């Protein structure tokens, strides 16, 4: 039943901020008012809210009000588990407590994830033993007693945990287990028997989570499940008319990942082994033969984007599609209830194979400019064995988002970094927000005084970076001098692990302060060590660009080794560049430069995490200052004071190090 809320958004926001010990922030108030207006008018809203704005309260307060008034849920989607946990474990409980006396009833909230994230009781009790899937394991592990016993121990622990856990949520298991172990006790949506057929349907952890979400006022989920809900034949999320997408800068990539598919020898072999006891041997032999021929072909073929499918590969894909489809039909005729779970799992894999092969074949029917999918072949080195993967992914997810997300719900998209080159247009285009769609962009700024707190230093005197990805001797000298001036306290963000490791080795020889490198330990442990010792530096690659939050004196220098353009041979992004060019646009600026600008904004955003932080972002790529696109890239970063004077920067870092030493 809908409720009447007598107090306004500004009034409730003020109560919440005061109760949580915060302070009034103009950007937060402006954002909350804009979110409330969007929910009222149905106009989509894109909000850039810098670190420190308090954006979660700015959208949660109007979301709760509308949920109570409309008696309908508001869905909040995030990219990362960390933000999900922050919302469900901290922000929402504190907010609900603070507003209890000001609202007609206590709001309810729930966390909902994809089915694979929850334990499957049917799989645990009816089909799981450590040896059940031995024939699906890599050959080298079948004879490794350590690997076998490790899997067995994990499965035993998971089975015991199933009888004590309330949620069955993988993220609640401490310590966690690897993907292979978790796959022994979980199922995908396709593998699920369904609540009506499953003997454990009434106890199902996933169904319980969906039930709780159906009763909630605010449902917290992730971009992957949001994408699954968009493409699924039946609804996964509760019916909703209002949606908030936090960490929206990741939305297009996460949706692309969900909409992608692949074919590998391992998947084909697993499918053949799963059906051995379920169907006529001739059906199995047909699938095995088609799989063997296809696997041999992709191992021998040249990796890279496939613009034209040759007749031979098309024949192999057709044979694979038909064999998988026939096997699926044979499984569906089975009626033995004792093998229902096994048949469901096998059927899911076969459907995936058949659908993916069909999709790849269909993608080559139209001419190149009109294609909606990109197909490419990768050869991955996995320890001692090579792995060939044929992948297909959408060229764009704009139409999917426009028709299946924005057409269904008024949407607020927010992040600290959404403008590229000073404009929302690039992001809006990637999402499918066009001039025909009612939307507006709003930048509420940041509580930080960037020009007084930070310096953007571009090392214009350095030679342009080489194609091999490794740093020049001049660049390594520059890194050593900057870290020495900063007294350690450096986060080094590199475009590749090769470059990060090379710089780490060089700095360990030259510097007296510790240098950690991604891969030395878990990322969380490395960040803890980095935070605990102000003299320590931490080098790494992409995950550190976006996932590190180190406020205070432990971080005063962010090093970026080169402009993070995508690889020229990246099949998906190069195809997108070509598609833009075919329409008369600038493919490099629209795709490659925008990709780099977003990563640069994310990386430089690691520097200032609270209003008292100070420091330098140093870009060791002279093209940032000399190339035509340099101004576009700089306009995408926070408004730091800018310089190319190395002497000034080193002096500033030394002053900052002395000041922090006195203060601490």
Curated annotation (Swiss-Prot):
Keyword terms of this UniProt record: 4Fe-4S, ATP-binding, DNA damage, DNA recombination, DNA repair, DNA-binding, Helicase, Hydrolase, Iron, Iron-sulfur, Isomerase, Metal-binding, Nucleotide-binding
List of residues binding [4Fe-4S] cluster: 120, 192, 198, 204
Catalytic activity, reaction form: Couples ATP hydrolysis with the unwinding of duplex DNA at the replication fork by translocating in the 5'-3' direction. This creates two antiparallel DNA single strands (ssDNA). The leading ssDNA polymer is the template for DNA polymerase III holoenzyme which synthesizes a continuous strand; ATP + H2O = ADP + phosphate + H(+)
Regulation of this protein's activity per its record: Helicase activity on G4 DNA is inhibited by porphyrin derivatives meso-tetra (N-methyl-4-pyridyl) porphine tetra tosylate (T4) and N-methyl mesoporphyrin IX (NMM). Helicase activity on forked duplexes is not inhibited by T4 or NMM.
Biological process annotations from GO: DNA recombination; DNA repair
Helicase ATP-binding domain sequence ranges: 14-290
Entry's EC annotation: 5.6.2.3
Any Pfam family: Helicase_C_2
Other facts noted in the record for this chain: Dimethyl sulfate protection studies on 3 short, promoter-derived oligonucleotides (18 to 46 bases long) suggest they form G4 DNA structures in vitro.
Protein name: ATP-dependent helicase DinG
Organism of derivation: Mycobacterium tuberculosis (strain ATCC 25177 / H37Ra)
The gene coding this protein: dinG
């Amino acid at each position: 039943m809908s409720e009447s809320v007598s107090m306004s958004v500004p009034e409730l926001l003020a109560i919440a901020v005061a109760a949580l010990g915060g302070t009034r922030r103009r950007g937060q108030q402006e954002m909350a008012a804009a979110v409330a207006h969007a929910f009222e008018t149905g106009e989509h809203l894109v909000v850039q809210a810098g670190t420190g704005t308090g954006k979660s309260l700015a959208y949660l307060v109007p979301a709760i009000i509308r949920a109570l008034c409309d008696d309908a849920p508001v869905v909040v989607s995030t990219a990362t588990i960390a933000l999900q946990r922050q919302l469900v474990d901290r922000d929402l409980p504190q907010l609900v407590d603070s507003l209890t006396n000001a609202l007609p009833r206590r709001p309810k909230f729930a966390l909902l994830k994809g089915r694979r994230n929850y334990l499957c009781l049917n799989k645990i009790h009816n089909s799981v033993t450590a040896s059940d899937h031995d024939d699906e394991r890599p050959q080298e592990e079948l004879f490794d007693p350590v690997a076998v016993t490790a899997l067995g121990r994990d499965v035993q622990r998971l089975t015991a945990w199933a009888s004590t856990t309330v949620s069955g949520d993988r993220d609640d298991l401490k310590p966690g287990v690897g993907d292979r172990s978790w796959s022994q006790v979980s199922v995908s949506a396709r593998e699920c028997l369904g609540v009506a057929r499953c003997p454990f349907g009434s106890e199902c952890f996933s169904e319980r989570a969906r039930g709780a979400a159906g009763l909630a006022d605010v449902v917290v989920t992730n971009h992957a499940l949001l994408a699954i809900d968009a493409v699924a034949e039946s609804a996964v999320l509760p019916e909703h008319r209002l949606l908030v997408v936090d960490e929206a800068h990741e939305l297009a990539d996460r949706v692309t990942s969900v909409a992608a598919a692949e074919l590998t020898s391992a998947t084909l072999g697993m499918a053949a082994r799963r059906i051995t006891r379920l169907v006529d041997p001739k059906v199995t032999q047909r699938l095995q033969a088609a799989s063997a021929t296809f696997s041999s072909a992709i191992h021998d073929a040249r990796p890279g984007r496939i613009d034209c499918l040759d007749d031979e590969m098309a024949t192999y894909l057709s044979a694979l599609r038909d064999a998988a489809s026939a096997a699926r039909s044979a499984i569906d005729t089975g009626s033995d209830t004792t093998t229902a779970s096994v048949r469901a799992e096998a059927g899911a894999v076969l459907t995936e194979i058949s659908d993916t092969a069909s999709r790849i074949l269909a993608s080559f029917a139209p001419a190149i400019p009109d294609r909606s999918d990109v197909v490419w072949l990768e050869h991955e080195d996995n320890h001692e064995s090579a792995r060939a993967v044929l992948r297909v992914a959408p060229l764009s997810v704009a139409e999917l988002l426009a028709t299946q997300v924005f057409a269904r719900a008024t949407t607020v998209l927010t992040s600290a970094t959404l403008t590229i080159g000073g404009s929302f247009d690039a992001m809006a285009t990637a999402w499918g927000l066009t001039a025909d769609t009612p939307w507006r962009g709003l930048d509420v700024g940041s509580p930080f005084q960037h020009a007084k707190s930070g310096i953007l230093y571009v090392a214009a005197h350095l030679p342009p970076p080489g194609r091999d990805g490794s740093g020049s001797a001049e660049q390594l000298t520059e890194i050593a001098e900057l870290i020495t001036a900063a007294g350690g306290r450096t986060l080094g963000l590199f475009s590749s692990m090769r470059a990060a490791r090379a710089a780490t080795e060089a700095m360990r020889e030259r510097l007296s302060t510790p240098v950690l490198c991604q891969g030395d330990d878990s990322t969380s442990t490395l960040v803890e060590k980095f935070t605990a010792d102000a003299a320590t530096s931490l080098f790494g690659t992409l995950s550190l660009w976006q996932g590190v939050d180190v406020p205070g004196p432990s971080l005063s220098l962010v090093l970026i080794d080169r402009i993070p353009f995508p690889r020229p041979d990246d099949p998906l992004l190069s195809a997108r560049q070509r598609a833009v060019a075919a329409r008369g646009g600038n493919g490099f600026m629209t795709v490659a430069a925008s990709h780099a600008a977003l990563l640069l904004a994310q990386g430089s955003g690691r520097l200032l995490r609270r209003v008292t932080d100070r420091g330098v972002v140093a870009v060791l790529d002279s093209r940032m200052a000399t190339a035509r696109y340099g101004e576009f890239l700089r306009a995408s970063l926070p408004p730091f004071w800018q310089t190319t004077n190395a002497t000034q920067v080193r002096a500033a870092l030394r002053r900052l190090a002395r000041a922090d030493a006195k203060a601490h």
